[in-house]
Design a protein with these regions (language model features):
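Conserved ABC ATPase signature
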Residues: 115-119, 123
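A short, surface-exposed alpha-helical micro-motif characterized by mixed small hydrophobic
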Residues: 182-184
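A short, proline-enriched helix->beta-strand linker immediately N-terminal to the Walker B motif
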Residues: 134-138
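Helical segment within the ABC ATPase nucleotide-binding domain
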Residues: 155-168
């Protein structure tokens, strides 16, 4: 399922994503009667289990590659690091996985030797998606993945994410403040306000009202 989580700035969307990734810092505390992803009870996971799950079973794409990517590492180094953290592969196998991830986001192999500062906004966003996909996650969290892009690139990136979800049978939580945009690309929409869910609808219910 592709689920959209929408709301104005400060409504709690990104904090919800951080909770699902186990990234809520103390004194913050996650409070829920149940919180699970892919059969994992996130309320009881120890740190070691979180490290194994995060970036592997659950992956996240952030909104701005200028801040999310390491500026002093090449694209290859960052993809390779994501793989070696979670999989025991030889160099040839890692190269195959890296090139597969690049093809998935429609980037040429030459990008591997570039640094983030040498990439356009759209290319940087595709690199972040490739890093998220390289370990074949079951769930992808995309936190405002198109907010730093123009309208043409926004649709390209969202169409790319949808295509990868369908090809990989991968679930996606798409976080945005743009309800009309995400409703086109998701099955269901949750609306948040001041940290609470205030509405829920099927995407076709929203589009039929436009």
């Amino acid at each position: 399922e592709r689920l959209a989580l929408v709301g104005e700035s400060g409504s709690g969307k990104s904090m919800t994503a951080r909770a699902l990734m186990g990234l809520v810092r103390k004194p913050g505390k996650v409070s829920a009667s149940e919180l699970s992803v892919s059969g994992h009870d996130l309320l009881t996971l120890e740190n070691k289990a979180w490290r194994a799950l995060r970036g592997n079973g659950i992956a996240m794409v952030l909104q701005d590659p200028r801040y999310a990517l390491n500026p002093v590492q090449t694209v290859f180094a960052q993809l390779d690091e994501a793989l070696t953290l979670h999989q025991r592969l030889n160099r040839k196998q890692r190269l195959e996985k890296i090139n597969e991830a690049l093809r998935a986001v429609e980037l040429e192999p030459a990008v591997l030797q570039r640094y983030p500062g040498e990439l356009s906004g759209g290319m940087g966003q595709r690199v972040m998606i490739a890093i998220a996909l390289v370990n074949d996650p079951q769930v992808l969290i995309a936190d405002e993945p198109t907010s730093a892009l123009d309208a043409r690139l926004r649709n390209q990136i969202l169409e790319l994410l949808v295509a990868q979800c369908e090809q990989r049978q991968m679930a996606m939580l798409l976080i945005s403040h743009d309800l009309p945009l995400v409703a086109q690309h998701c099955h269901r929409v949750l609306v948040m306000y001041q940290g609470q869910k205030v509405d829920e609808m099927r995407s076709e219910e929203h589009t039929s009202e436009l």
